[in-house]
Amino acid sequence: IATQVDCSEHPKPACTLDYRPICGSDSKTYSNKCDFCNAVMDSNGTLTLSHFGKC
């Protein structure tokens, strides 16, 4: 099981509408890697991956 997501290409100005949910350490479900990685960048790295799938 992967415990990290590679956010090196983020943040991005726009994300696709793909639905591949990721649960963040803030107990929020992000709709895909792009949404999650943008939030990670906004949090200055304090947000981490909890698990793949809905929270």
Swiss-Prot record:
Kazal-like domain mapped to chain residues: 5-55
Subcellular location(s) of the protein: Secreted
Species per Swiss-Prot/TrEMBL record: Dacelo novaeguineae (Laughing kookaburra)
Domain text: Avian ovomucoid consists of three homologous, tandem Kazal family inhibitory domains.
Superkingdom of the source species: Eukaryota
Classification of source organism: Eukaryota, Metazoa, Chordata, Craniata, Vertebrata
Pfam families assigned: Kazal_1
Name by which UniProt lists this protein: Ovomucoid
Main localization of the protein described in the UniProt heading: secreted
Disulfide bridge map: C7-C37, C15-C34, C23-C55
Keyword terms: Disulfide bond, Glycoprotein, Protease inhibitor, Repeat, Secreted, Serine protease inhibitor
Entry coiled-coil feature ranges: none
PROSITE patterns from the UniProt entry: KAZAL_1 (PS00282), KAZAL_2 (PS51465)
Record site: Reactive bond 3: L17, D18
Annotated glycosylation sites: N44
